[in-house]
Regions:
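Regulatory N- and C-terminal appendages and interdomain linkers associated
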Residues: 1-179
Length: 179
């Protein structure tokens, strides 16, 4: 039982340390676990592409239109209540970021080292397999190259949401327990 308790504590400590880096925080603060939980709830509420969200968070500037800035990471149009949730979250994020002792640029560098620009997505594998069955290897070669440097945006065409044609396709828009 002690092993399970220790594992749980260690897991959540490492999780929170990783999340702090994803958000560009130089160190964990006392209430960061609550901040991460509120972010997770928001992402679930508004159906967001996490990879794109963090990429856009890196480039968020003061004074920018928050909803417009993040709209490419949302899988649906947001209603006013959802927009308010996003705006409030970003305000909380900026407040939390102000606790950093490092520069905004150093914070951004932490984010860039932690948040990949490329994540191999199942729909890309579907397309790659289909092409390879036709004897083509162009997509395979691009995927291979992108996998070698996931923290660099080598192919901007991979930095997009899952195409609508894959909505509802098991393994592309949702995963089963056996996936």
């Amino acid at each position: 039982e002690k092993i399970l308790i220790d594992y749980s504590e260690m897991f959540w400590k490492k999780h929170d340390e990783m999340m702090a880096k994803k958000f560009g925080f130089e160190k964990l603060e006392r209430y960061d676990a609550d901040f991460f939980t509120s972010w997770q709830k928001l992402m679930e509420e508004i159906s967001t592409d996490y990879t794109l969200f963090f990429s856009q968070l890196e480039s968020l500037e003061e004074g920018s239109d928050i909803i417009e800035h993040f709209k490419n990471s949302f899988y649906q149009n947001l209603n006013k209540d959802q927009e308010t949730l996003v705006i409030e979250f970003v305000e909380n994020y900026r407040q939390r970021l102000s606790y950093n002792q490092i520069s905004k640029e150093d914070s951004r560098k932490i984010m860039q080292k932690t948040n990949p620009k490329f994540v191999l997505r199942n729909y890309l594998l579907y397309d790659c397999i289909a092409e390879m069955e036709e004897g083509k290897t162009e997509l395979f070669d691009k995927l291979w190259n992108a996998l070698q440097k996931p923290y660099e945006e080598i192919y901007p065409e991979f930095s997009v949401k899952r195409p609508e044609k894959y909505e509802g396709v098991v393994g592309c828009s949702s995963l089963s327990c056996s996936s």
